[in-house]
Amino acid sequence: MPKLKTRKAAAKRFKATGTGKFLRRRAFRNHLLDHKSPKLKRHLATKAVVDRTDEDRVALMMPYA
C-alpha cells in the first residue's frame, strides 16, 4: 500500500498534541489591531484546541500526526 500524503496546507496550520488533539491559531490577529485592547490581543496570541466536530477532518488531512 502506498504511503499516505499529508495535506501541506493543514500541516502548516495545525499542530498535534501528545493526547491526539490539534492546536490552531486564533482568527482576528493579522491586521486592524489598533482598536483592539491589549488584553484581547494577548488572548488572540494563544493557541486554541480544534473543536471536536472538526478533529476527524484535520486528522484525515494529517495521517502521521
From Swiss-Prot:
GO-annotated biological processes: translation
One annotated Gene Ontology cellular component of this protein: cytosolic large ribosomal subunit
Organism (species): Synechococcus sp. (strain WH7803)
HAMAP family reported for this sequence: Ribosomal_bL35 (MF_00514)
An annotated Gene Ontology molecular function: structural constituent of ribosome
InterPro entries associated with the record: Ribosomal_bL35, Ribosomal_bL35-like, Ribosomal_bL35_CS, Ribosomal_bL35_sf
PROSITE patterns in the cross-refs: RIBOSOMAL_L35
Family: Belongs to the bacterial ribosomal protein bL35 family.
Gene3D superfamilies linked: 4.10.410.60
UniProt keyword list: Ribonucleoprotein, Ribosomal protein
Name under which the protein is recorded: Large ribosomal subunit protein bL35
Superkingdom, natural source: Bacteria
